[in-house]
Design a protein with these regions (language model features):
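Gram-negative (and chloroplast) outer-membrane scaffold detector with strong preference
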Residues: 49-148, 167, 179-181, 218, ...
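Flexible, solvent-exposed coil segments and beta strand-coil junctions
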Residues: 21-28, 78-88, 147-155, 196-200
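Predominantly the C-terminal beta-signal and adjacent terminal strand-loop region
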Residues: 69-70, 176-226
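Bacterial Sec-dependent N-terminal signal peptides
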Residues: 1-25
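Extracellular loop and loop/strand-boundary signature of outer-membrane beta-barrel proteins
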Residues: 29-34, 88-94, 155-161, 201-209
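Residues that define the transmembrane beta-barrel architecture of outer-membrane proteins
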Residues: 37-43, 96-102, 118, 163-169, ...
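A generic hydrophobic-segment detector
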Residues: 141-197
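Transmembrane beta-strand segments that form the barrel wall of outer-membrane beta-barrel proteins
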Residues: 22-43, 57-60, 192
Length: 226
């Protein structure tokens, strides 16, 4: 589903202005959610299409690596074979969460043009945010004696993985410098607030690393194609 969303957005933008200059960008970034204890390191890639010398449309896909929560949680697993001993075990786990972002919007450049020299830029955007939440169970039970995978099963109501899908709006601001015939280095900050979010199950709902307001700091390199 995620790949279809990205492909559709890319095709739409390319079809909108097929004959124009297009730029490709790659870079790294740090995502920080307001009120959550951890930051997420990631990377991004994107397209940018100029409407004129000072206004562009852009699309950016970002992936931010999973982080684990600090608090260990326990659950009970039950033996598949009713004759097994012990019949139940206590297993510890840590919950991890990542962020995937699909971001698009309009940028307005001040100073020099989009593809010339030093400029500052800013604009509004929309963002689709996908959080993958996973419970990472220890291989041994809480006593460190019994290996449980394959011989014991989780409670029927417990799902090891979940997803949160959110739609957000926000603003972006940044600076860039274009080296003639080489490319552009840039740095920008994006802030987004979630208007709508939906968790797929209780595993996703219970993550402590989801935030409705996020900030992303990006560094990267952009290459213009003519």
């Amino acid at each position: 589903m995620y790949s279809k969303l990205v492909s559709s957005a890319v095709l739409f933008i390319l079809a909108f202005n097929l004959q124009s200059q297009v730029s490709l960008s790659l870079g790294s970034g740090v995502l920080k959610g307001f009120g959550i204890p951890k930051s997420f390191l990631g990377f991004h890639g994107g397209f940018e299409l100029p409407r004129n010398n000072d206004v562009t449309l852009y699309l950016r896909l970002g992936y931010y690596l999973p982080r684990k929560e600090d608090d260990t949680i326990s659950t009970s697993v039950t033996a598949i074979n009713p004759l097994s001993s012990p019949s139940t075990l206590t297993v510890n786990y840590l919950t991890s969460t990542n962020y995937t972002t699909i971001e698009g919007g309009t940028r307005y450049y001040l100073g020099n043009d989009y593809d010339n020299g030093f400029s500052v830029y800013g604009g509004s955007n929309f963002m689709l945010i996908i959080n993958s939440v996973k419970r990472n169970y220890e291989k041994l039970d809480a006593t460190g004696v019994y290996s449980w995978e394959g011989d014991y099963e989780l409670p029927e109501y417990e799902v090891p993985k979940g997803t949160i899908l959110s739609l957000a709006l926000g603003l972006q601001g940044g600076v860039k410098y274009t080296f003639p015939a080489r490319g552009t280095i840039y740095a920008d900050i994006t802030g987004n607030y979630t208007l709508f979010g939906k968790a797929s199950n209780t595993t996703a709902q219970n993550t402590a690393l989801y935030a409705p307001m996020i900030f992303i700091f990006n560094l990267g390199f952009r290459k213009d194609l003519y």
